[in-house]
């Protein structure tokens, strides 16, 4: 790649976003299968972004459970989105099938009380429905985050779950990612050079 410009043009490849998105999704799927998981439930912002190539809005950051994604077997990711943000995802992220964008059943991590238990039941029922749709309901679900409400509801629903954070951490740097890191380093490097 001869040019690292950030603006897309029709006469240079520059950053191939499709290739990066495909790489990340397939890499997550590969790691999921290597760990004998039928599905991955991703609740941390960085993992949701890695698999879905969507951005977590500021008010959802660092709050696992407000927005999450489910990767089942060889299927496209299912994104459970906050409110009507899903409408914007449908418009701006055509790589996620429209039928795979759902409303999230959200609670803030570690919440207590009857309302949080009601929400986590809806949350779990929605996960099981998607896992059945992709024929992985009898397989182990990898999770990158779990709280006491999820733990209790997963046990009640007879969901076999395991560590999903470790597979997500096992990544290598594709050449495209190296290019992006070089681009993001350029402005501060220029600043220090001028000092």
Please identify what each model-predicted range represents.
Residues 193-195:
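Extended, charge-rich low-complexity interaction segments
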Residues 1-191:
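A composition/biophysics-driven feature that prefers long, compositionally simple stretches
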